[in-house]
């Protein structure tokens, strides 16, 4: 440990100044003026160290910055390595010959300049001083004594670095180099290495580190990254206007509905005039319908005139539920208002016009039944229901081509037999009209069965 004081150049067993061991080997009293900055703390006494050279006269101890007016104070406690012992004498040098002693450990308080870029709250108090020029480093040059590595330029990066920068781009919150903690050592703290200026804006939290240390990056404020993106003339707004007139019924500029539902456009393809998906929506269509009937599928009830075609709110034809041909022309409205029934789908629309003679009994039968009174007995309704099914089966029999061994033949025969059993279960109730209607229906089914049997031979 060195016993010399930077201010007095004397050993520790005497006064702190006034004695100097010159190169001649004798004690030459030299009166040095008192130091400009007195020591802040007393130093513990240290054992005297002989400064005599081992091979003769002692070598001079060269103090960096001594002739340039250096006024710093170097407290004892730092290790001074013996650089060389060649020639019988040794010369002590500081571990980093390019730096002044007051540059490393200075007693001057460092007041950071207020910068225009605010540091994040989690990084305040960690010796991270931000400056308006975008560089991080010591707050002011080290002093007039240190002329070797004077840090004057704002964008100056020293030619040598003492840390290993990884070649990969670090993460947003990854510490640079080999620092142990992720957040406490973003910049190397100025107690450790104050002269090293990191890459400019390279390791600010939230920005990836630059691969080139000397390249300056433009600083964009947080949350405003796309301000520098050039706007393409007049193509941005017409494109939005083109999307605004979309076919999905959104009249607003953006396609998704906001908290207040937007009114659908007049040319909407997927909006119905009777009901809209949003209940509180005010639609600008000309005459809104009175209370809608909530159709099962909005696409089926798009045409307002097609809603009254059937009771089931399907746009299918009413002829699916009535007998084909002349029956629909004569009393289709009467049947539809009195009888509610279901039947197989109509497969052949032109088959009824080929055999009009077979439909004459069925045409007269409903008229005779309904001419008596509006309150049709249930037995008559059941007979009419059976006759409607027989109409479709008769069409199937007319189209049948095959033999008795075919499955189609078995199916038609079984269906006709089932309708005969339905007619047998009808109770007449002592009424001649019901008995007559049932008899005619049974005769018709038997005639169809005979026709089917002849075709199957």
From Swiss-Prot:
It holds the Pfam family BAG. The modification Phosphoserine is found at residue 7. Changing residue 441 to P: Abolishes interaction with HSP70 and TNFRSF1A. GO terms for cellular component: cytosol; nucleus; plasma membrane. GO terms for biological process: cellular response to epidermal growth factor stimulus; cellular response to tumor necrosis factor; negative regulation of mRNA modification; negative regulation of phosphatidylinositol-3,4,5-trisphosphate 5-phosphatase activity; negative regulation of protein targeting to mitochondrion; positive regulation of actin filament polymerization; positive regulation of cell adhesion; positive regulation of fibroblast migration. PROSITE patterns: BAG. Residues 1-20, 255-268 have a biased composition (Low complexity). Residues 379-456 form the BAG domain. Its main location: cytoplasm. InterPro entries: BAG_chaperone_regulator, BAG_dom_sf, BAG_domain. GO terms for molecular function: protein-containing complex binding; protein-folding chaperone binding; ubiquitin protein ligase binding. Residues 31-48, 284-295 have a biased composition (Pro residues). Transmembrane segments: none annotated. The modification Omega-N-methylarginine is found at residues 41, 54, 108, 185. Keywords: Chaperone, Cytoplasm, Methylation, Phosphoprotein. It is found in: Cytoplasm. Binds to the ATPase domain of HSP/HSC70 chaperones. Binds to the death domain of TNFRSF12. Binds to the death domain of TNFRSF1A in the absence of TNF and thereby prevents binding of adapter molecules such as TRADD or TRAF2. Interacts with PRKN. Inhibits the chaperone activity of HSP70/HSC70 by promoting substrate release. Prevents constitutive TNFRSF1A signaling. Negative regulator of PRKN translocation to damaged mitochondria. This is BAG family molecular chaperone regulator 4. It comes from Mus musculus (Mouse). The gene is Bag4.
């Amino acid at each position: 440990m060195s016993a010399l004081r930077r201010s007095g150049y004397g050993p520790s067993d005497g006064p702190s100044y006034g004695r100097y061991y010159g190169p001649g080997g004798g004690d030459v009293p030299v009166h040095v003026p008192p130091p400009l900055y007195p020591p802040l703390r007393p130093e513990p006494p240290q054992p005297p160290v002989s400064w005599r050279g081992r091979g003769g006269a002692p070598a001079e101890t060269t103090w960096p910055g001594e002739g340039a007016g250096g006024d710093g104070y170097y407290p004892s406690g730092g290790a001074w390595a013996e650089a060389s012992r060649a020639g019988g004498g040794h010369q002590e040098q500081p571990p980093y010959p390019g730096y002044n002693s007051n540059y490393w450990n200075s007693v001057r308080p460092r007041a950071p300049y207020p910068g225009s870029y605010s540091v994040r709250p989690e990084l305040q108090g960690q010796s991270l001083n931000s400056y308006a020029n975008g560089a991080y480093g010591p707050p002011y040059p080290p002093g007039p004594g240190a002329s070797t590595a004077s840090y004057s330029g704002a964008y100056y990066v020293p030619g040598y670095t003492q840390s290993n920068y990884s070649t990969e781009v670090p993460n947003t919150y990854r510490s640079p180099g080999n620092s142990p903690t992720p957040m406490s050592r973003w910049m190397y703290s100025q107690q450790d290495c104050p002269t090293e200026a990191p890459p400019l804006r390279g390791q600010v939290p939230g920005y990836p580190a630059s691969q080139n240390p000397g390249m300056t990056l433009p600083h964009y404020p947080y949350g405003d990254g796309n301000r520098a993106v050039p706007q393409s003339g007049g193509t941005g707004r017409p494109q939005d206007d083109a999307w605004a007139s979309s076919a999905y019924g959104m009249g607003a500029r953006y396609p998704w509905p906001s908290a207040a539902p937007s009114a659908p456009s007049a040319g909407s393809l997927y909006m119905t005039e009777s009901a809209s998906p949003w209940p509180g929506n005010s639609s600008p269509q000309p005459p809104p319908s009175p209370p809608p009937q909530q159709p099962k599928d909005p696409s089926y009830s798009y045409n307002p005139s097609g809603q009254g075609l059937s009771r089931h709110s399907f746009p299918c034809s009413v002829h699916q539920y009535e007998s084909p041909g002349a029956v629909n022309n004569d009393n289709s409205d009467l049947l539809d208002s009195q009888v509610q029934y279901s039947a197989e789908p109509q497969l052949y629309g032109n088959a009824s016009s080929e055999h009009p003679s077979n439909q004459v009994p069925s045409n007269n039968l409903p008229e005779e039944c309904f001419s008596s009174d509006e309150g049709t007995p249930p037995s008559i309704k059941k007979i009419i229901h059976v006759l409607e099914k027989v109409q479709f089966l008769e069409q199937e029999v007319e189209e049948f081509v095959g033999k008795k061994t075919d499955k189609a033949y078995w199916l038609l025969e079984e269906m006709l037999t089932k309708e005969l059993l339905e007619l047998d279960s009808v109770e007449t109730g002592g009424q001649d009209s019901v008995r007559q209607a049932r008899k005619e229906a049974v005769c018709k089914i038997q005639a169809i069965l005979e026709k089917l049997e002849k075709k199957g031979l």
